[in-house]
Amino acid sequence: MRLPPARKGWIVAALGTAQTIGWASSYYVPAVLAAPMAASFDLSPVWVFGAFSMAMVVSATVGPWAGARIDRIGGRGVLILSNLVFAAGLAVLAVAGSPGLLFLGWAVIGIGMGMGLYEAAFATLAGIYGKEARGPITGITLIAGFASTVGWPLSGLMLATWGWREACLGWALIHLALALPLNAFLPKGTERIPAETPEPAAGPPPSRRALWLLAFVFAVTWFNSTAMAAHLPGLLQAAGASSAMAIAAGAMIGPAQVAARVLEFGLLRRFHPLISARLAASAHPLAAVCLVGFGGPAAYAFALLHGAGNGILTIAKGTLPLALFGSAGYGARLGWLNAPARVLQAAAPLIFGAALAAWGLQAIWLTAGIGALATLALLAIRRG
């Protein structure tokens, strides 16, 4: 039975809000809480970031299982379970009395990340809407694109008011009181709406070449995204921007991502996702050329181009596998496609940080080069 348009809007709003909480309470926590966490154990903050990197590797191992489970039974139960796992991991952090428990808490959060972030949400929408999930996928990324906008200030407020342990406990309670009920609002099973053009029951197996190319694209673009998230201010200062300009330019990435997703929702949705993905992948290399060519004054242009490309690529990671390979087995396939990306993402801050320390601004050619390779890989993928 077709889901009413109003119900469709509520599903996107509920899942997008739950995703905002998931990202804000995991991916964006270390930027605010790593230093006080480490200080309470007499450790360097690098240990907390190391624990977070471990969590991303854990999420890579969980993702394929979670995706396959969503393919079989729908996403509602898996996403609800992810909220319980997130809450448990955050609670372990809140009561951790030793570095071992700190790492254990992050490992549990990594399980929650593998079950409850974008890949699981995209698979849930594919189970409900089939090949018509592109619009809803864009919708939840529009909402969750504000995760850092919400998460960093809220984590900072809880830290300043109560402390880092209470901040972790606060996020755990938010999962139980808000995110879990929102995910419970989702349809049970795979309540598929009928597509305007019915999908075939079975088609030829996906091209192994296309799968490998797509896995490569996802891995290197996630590497670039994470490297820039960790080191953008330092990179822009190496180009000649002042500290204030670097911070101000960095603040433009979030709005650029959201603006690009609005463009995808309004204009680019008329085209095959490969078209928008190719344009998006070329944005970072173009931004790098601007930064090297014009130095510090190009900081804003770099941030806007990188942010816009990253915003559309986030959507493409959900829509491209759906458009190329269909919705059958989508969740498991998405989990496997993103597993290398999570591992490389975990290493990105260390690798690019070392390159920036050794080469200064010229380190940008590392990310520009692999961004160009991603564009070439996307050009090598054919719609059929």
Where are the model-predicted features located?
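Intracellular juxtamembrane helix-capping segments at the cytosolic ends
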Residues: M115-Y129, I312-F325
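Conserved MFS/SLC helix-loop-helix module at the cytosolic interface between two early adjacent transmembrane helices
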Residues: T61-P99
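Helix-to-loop junctions at the C-terminal end of transmembrane segments
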Residues: V62-G74, A260-P273, L356
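Symmetry-related core transmembrane helices of the 12-TM Major Facilitator Superfamily/SLC fold
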Residues: E166-A184, A363-A380
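A late C-terminal transmembrane helix in Major Facilitator Superfamily
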Residues: S148, S327-W359
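C-terminal transmembrane helical hairpin of 12-TM major facilitator-type secondary transporters
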Residues: I253-Q257, F271-L320
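Extracytoplasmic
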Residues: W10-P45, V62-A66, W152, T226-P233
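Extracytoplasmic gate region of multi-pass secondary transporters
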Residues: P30-A34, R208-A259
